[in-house]
From Swiss-Prot:
Matches recorded under NCBIfam families: lepA (TIGR01393), small_GTP (TIGR00231)
Entry EC number(s): 3.6.5.-
Any GO CC annotation of this UniProt entry: mitochondrial matrix
Gene name linked to the record: GUF1
Stated name of the protein: Translation factor GUF1, mitochondrial
UniProt subcellular location: Mitochondrion inner membrane
Length: 643
């Protein structure tokens, strides 16, 4: 059951490699690479990826493999194929994600052509993993000997298993003093039913056993690709990125046939036609070999104008031979699941910022962007993200780059409104939430998105974590003791809306950092959610409204009015701050009018002047009042939202 769910969940990755160009390689070097590939039969191709929980050593192991096969020079911890860390730190991406290697296996006296695809283990980028799986015959399931099986290990296992990949269990970090190899092997056998005898023990750091045991296992256990050279050419579009010199670059897996530079191809999904300008392998940079054939994973430069024409999962075919070519099953398009509003702060121009925001989004194909207008904050944008991590990474990036220039609202998830007349509406903005009258008369049910969360943790934190999940409206579905040593796996159905509220941070803090989390969409469920609004002198500030479960409304409402009061300076008239849900006021705070003492400097005798001044003050008040809540400095909104 989980396996089928796993297939359903498919995401785009959200960063683009900036690939160094390899035309620097001497033509003779490229010729010899070409010759070497030509001499290797498809039976000697091995396409695989490494899957693991974050920090279990994927990138380090990739480095060792690239060194041992002579792709890169040995020495140092380079993480040549790593991107997520850099992405997190600097919001940029530096390296290609896939690499071709040549390996001469002395046992057989033969050359092998190996494609390694490194994958980020994080949940929001699961699509990355599944897409790379689609071009692989197998995967190394890497487990840190000092940590054992963790949440992403489990989730990635299900995905790989569901895609029929041959899995090689690998225990890493056996050089560590506190490595508990026996325990890790136990967990792998108990959790995944992969026999202990099949496990390979390595140290990616020192390289121990990588050459001796791991490379031979890759050759012996991972099956070669199954395509057919004589069939019409077809390729699966696995990934794409934008290169400022050559434009759109596609990473493709050649399923059948052969394709060459200059060939004309067409896309099954868009029907558009292209002529291949450049073609080759990632080694580790773009290395133009002029040809790719069945079973290989490589790149093509199609002279494509827009990145959005590169549909992940698309099939490329030879122009004119579409009728005889079977289109590949492809992938499901990912849908944004977390949304925020962004608005220019005081004094910033929408127009100028619009270009910036659009540019930022352009680099990240998986972000959706729409115009939006707010009563308090004016014209802005609505941004959609794949998941809560994706949203927070991007939001951090916006804040770092546009800090004071943008006001960013609280994240929200989509809600499904089901009407009595049978139609449905998906809303991604609290502003679209049906009002009480509509709810009473027309709405049959409101649903919110749920996920199945997998958590692993040491038993001593079980109580804390269960409490946290209950507090976040979770429903326990499974509890499994991974082995005798006290590692537990918990499964909960949780509302995605709760996850967005820094659930991961809270989980880490109640487990002293030991618990790990992974999750997967499981669809929409009926829910008693309402819209909570913040009112200022009676009018609702739309950009601050939030949809939440009715059980949370009271607590959040009280906190809101209290907090907002802190940021409002006293005005010349009374300001009433209220929280309202379902047409009912939940909480209220008042800021007393500040009576500017305009009379202070006057002598008591100067009565006419005194009267005049009082009248003037009254008019001033009237003027401010007529402007109403807009008098609030936008800094206040910004401070309120930055909690
Ligand atoms: P990834 O997130 O799975 O790509 O993990 P990394 O390759 O970035 O490794 C995470 C951390 O573990 C880094 O600090 C590595 O240096 C360290 N590491 C990886 N493999 C080993 C190993 O075999 N032994 C030891 N002691 N540390 C390792
Ligand atoms: Mg890594």
């Amino acid at each position: 059951m989980l396996a089928s769910q796993a297939i359903k969940r498919i995401f785009h990755r959200s960063w683009k490699p900036l690939v160094r160009f390899n035309h620097g390689k001497a033509p003779t070097a490229i010729e010899s690479i070409k010759k070497r590939i030509e001499d290797i039969p498809i039976e000697n191709y091995r396409n695989f990826s490494i899957v693991a929980h974050i920090d279990h050593g994927k990138s380090t192991l990739s480095d060792r493999l690239l060194e041992l096969t002579g792709v890169i020079q040995s020495g140092g911890n380079k993480q040549v194929l790593d991107r997520l860390e850099v992405e997190r730190e600097r919001g940029i991406t530096v390296k290609a994600q896939t690499c071709t290697m040549f390996y001469h296996d002395k046992r057989y006296g033969k050359d092998f052509l190996i494609h390694l695809v490194d994958t980020p283990g994080h949940v929001d980028f699961r699509g990355e993993v599944s897409r790379s799986y689609a071009s692989c015959g197998g995967a190394l399931l890497l487990v840190d000997a000092s940590q054992g099986v963790q949440a992403q290990t489990v989730a990635n296992f299900y995905l790989a298993y569901s895609m029929n990949l041959k899995l090689i269990p690998v225990i890493n970090k056996i050089d560590l003093d506190h490595a508990d190899i026996a325990q890790a092997e136990d967990q792998i056998e108990n959790t995944f039913e992969l026999p202990k005898e099949d496990t390979i023990r390595v140290s990616a750091k020192t390289g121990l056993n990588v050459k001796e045991d791991l490379l031979p296992a890759i050759i012996d256990r991972i099956p070669p690709p199954t395509g057919c050279l004589d069939k019409p050419f077809r390729a699966l579009l696995v990934d794409s990125w934008y290169d400022s010199y050559v434009g759109v670059v596609l990473l493709v897996h050649i399923v059948d046939g052969t394709v060459r530079k200059g060939d004309k191809v067409s896309s099954a999904q868009t029907g558009k036609k292209y002529e291949i300008k450049e073609i080759g392998i990632m080694f580790p940079d773009r290395t133009p070999t002029g040809i790719l054939s069945t079973g290989q994973v490589g790149y093509v430069v199609p002279g494509m104008k827009a990145s959005k024409d590169a549909k992940i999962g698309d099939t490329l075919m030879h122009l004119g031979r579409e009728q005889e070519t079977e289109v590949l099953p492809g992938f499901e398009e990912p849908k944004p699941m977390v949304f925020v509003g962004a608005f220019p702060s005081d004094g910033e121009e929408f127009k100028a910022l619009n270009d910036d925001v659009n540019r930022l989004v352009l680099n990240d194909r998986s972000v959706s962007l729409k115009r939006e207008t707010s009563n308090a904050l004016g014209q802005g944008w609505r941004l959609g993200f794949l998941g809560s991590l994706h949203a927070s990474v991007f939001r951090e990036r916006l804040e770092n780059e546009y800090g004071s220039k943008l006001i960013i609202t609280q994240p929200t998830v989509p809600y499904m409104i089901k009407y009595y007349d049978g139609h449905e509406r998906l809303i991604t903005n609290p502003d679209e939430f049906p009002d009480l009258a509509e709810r009473r008369n027309k709405v049959q049910a409101i649903q919110e998105p749920y996920v199945e969360a997998i958590m692993t943790l040491p038993q001593e934190y079980l109580g804390n974590v269960i409490k946290l999940c209950d507090h976040n409206r979770g429903q326990q579905t499974e509890i499994t003791y991974l082995n005798m040593t006290g590692q537990v796996m918990l499964k909960y159905d949780l509302p995605l809306g709760q996850l967005v509220e820094d659930f991961f941070g809270k989980l880490k803090s109640v487990s002293r950092g030991y618990a790990s989390l992974d999750y997967e969409d499981i669809g929409y469920r009926d829910s008693d959610v309402v819209k909570l609004e913040l009112l200022i002198n009676g009018s609702s500030v739309d950009a601050l409204a939030q949809v939440m479960h009715s059980s949370q409304v009271e607590r959040v409402g009280r906190a809101w009015v209290k907090k907002f009061k802190e940021y409002i300076k006293a005005q010349l008239f009374e300001v009433v701050i209220q929280a309202r849900a379902n047409s009912k006021i939940i909480a209220r705070e008042t800021i007393k009018a500040k009576r500017k003492d305009v009379l202070q400097k006057l002598h008591a005798s100067d009565i006419s002047r005194r009267k005049k001044l009082l009248v003037k003050q009254k008019e001033g008040k009237k003027h401010l009042k007529s402007v109403g809540n807009v008098q609030i400095n936008q800094d206040a909104y910004q401070a309120f939202l930055r909690r």
